[in-house]
Amino acid sequence: MAYTSVIPVRRLDRAVKYVMNKEKTTAVSLQDALDYAANRDKTEQSCFESSYTCTLETAFADMRQTKERWHKSGGVQGYHLVQSFAAGEVTPELAHQIAKELADRMLGGRYQYVIGTHLNTGHIHSHIVWNSVSCVDGKKYRSN
């Protein structure tokens, strides 16, 4: 069974950077989380990276642009979800597919996100970082 944790992000730039970061760091902002999720040193293969309505390379700029378009640049900037699996529980492909399905169902095609599935520890884990502002209608994300 997967373990998940969601962290609200106040600095989108740092969270994005964290997700794609080549060194293991602690998420501080959205830029950090996005950088870390797409970190190729941790994914080993580019097939374990995905994004929705943004590109991995420009995710922070794309998300910031959405915020500016809807005049919602303050407050929580995004969210960083970590989904971890026990050793041997899933293959990297399955873990990544589960993360994509979770993001699609949870965000309903309304929020930009990036996913990186990492293989650098004893357990496979995925990072999902998404924008707090909807690219469809400008509404802020609210969890139930």
What are these regions (language model features)?
Residues 1-144:
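N-terminal nicking endonuclease/strand-transfer module with a His-rich metal-binding environment
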